[in-house]
Amino acid sequence: YTGWLLHGTKGGLAAGIFFVLPSVLILLLLSIIYVTFGDLPWVSALFQGLKPAVVAIVILAMIKIAKKSLVTNYHYIIALLSFIAIYFYNISFPLIILGTIVFALVHHKWINKSNNQSNQNSAINQDEKGYYLTTSSVIPHAGFQLKRLVSQIALFAILWVAPLLLFYSLSSNFSFWQQLSLFFTQAAFVTFGGAYAVLPYVAQQAVENFQWLSSAQMIDGLALGETTPGPLIMVLAFVGFMGGYQAFGSSLLAGSLGLLTTTYYTFLPCFLFIFAGAPIIEKTQHNTHIKHILSFVTAAVTGVILNLTLYFAEAVIFGKTAENLLSINWHEVQWLNVIWIVISVIALYRFKIDMLIWLAVSAIFGLTTYFIA
């Protein structure tokens, strides 16, 4: 988006591609190493040390988002309802977002209509002297044009269909590639709130429905994503790698193609949103109605991230995931992992230890416990 603001379409393409490309290459290499050497005892021990730290990172991410998004009792209610919906009733993330938007519209029209009319007329007074772009800057390419919008959507459709036609012509298992492409396109369209928001939805579908990987492998993928540069959403690329790897009989080539396909179909809609939607956003960024809706969507995302936290915590603490907290066998608690989760939260939150440094410490902890045992 910043690249588009500064230099138009070329700037947006350059910024987007080079933001993602390094992490794609690194994660591809790490994924190949993971499936090749992951069964070695010492490598497995390394990931065992990382998993509790990853749970701690997700817990802290949830707390950080909750502090910013839960500002009224209504936001707390939406967060609680979204958690109940996805955790106890397996209601899909897109439906939760849709329901939240409907509630936000009703709330804004009937409940919040008398609240702070002055907020609509107030602006944030900020000294913008010295900034390259300010709220008063005139951006020539930011104007909305219907013809340009239609051509961008048409180009997006062509770019979306083209790889599928190649898979249809060349692959013996077209249904897998079709499923992979459709799923991650859909995931991209409902990614409100970043990687942590969409991960529960991806984990639910990829692990339980498609069975591309196990819950333990999903946590390993998150650990790899946390330790590589670039956006955390690249964890989805690891899911695509494991899907291709499993679907084609432990094929590294299919896994690599799965990773690249997942990356393509995850980020292609993002480029469409920027190039087609940015002019609209520029016109509506001060619209209080849209801000009101997005505040409730963020609150719902908090509840979804709580579900993600429990999902990963169950796998790390009990060695498996359960349908809900009521069905957990509390005699299976792995206390060493519980202790390391608590220590990790304290280290990262209280003592502000750098996340990458702590992940390295956690990996060493896993190796140490393995050699001692």
Task: Please provide the spans of the model-predicted regions.
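Multi-pass membrane proteins that catalyze or facilitate reactions on polyprenyl-/lipid-phosphate substrates
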Residues: 1-228, 235-373
